[in-house]
Amino acid sequence: MRETPSSHPGEASVDGVIDQLLFLAHFFGRRADAVQLLADTPITGGRISEAHIFECAQRGGLSLSRAKKGVADFKASELPALVFAPEGGDPLILLRRDGDSFECVQAGIRGSVKLELSALTADYAGVAYFVRPLVFFDTRSLLYHL
């Protein structure tokens, strides 16, 4: 049975997740490395849980928010997004949308590829997260401008 966007991904491949989080951190201009992202994250059998994916993303200066709609309804302004296959393999980054196709970044050295919407919805029907940079606001700086 396929997972819906509102279901939990459970676990995913730690190598694929970290590769994609590193790419996204660099995409948003943040310096990050695998050691920094993993820090004290428990890894069992090469898998990482959903809660730990959120922690690793925060260490890389990223904010993940779960998509409440399917990939077909994603707008170009909502990208990038991190999508998972139901079996929890390597996630895929949806970088840009062009009509019914997406420019996608694959984990590892496989690079980017253009995928049609039909292929995406068939292969990556698991959960999806919209990715944004974390914004740090220092309230002390506000005092200097008053």
Give residue spans per PLM region.
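Noncatalytic regulatory segments and standalone regulatory/sensor domains
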Residues: 1-2, 18, 41-48, 54, ...
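Cysteine-nucleophile protease catalytic domains, especially the papain-like/related folds used
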Residues: 1-66
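Membrane-cytosol interface segments
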Residues: 65-69, 102
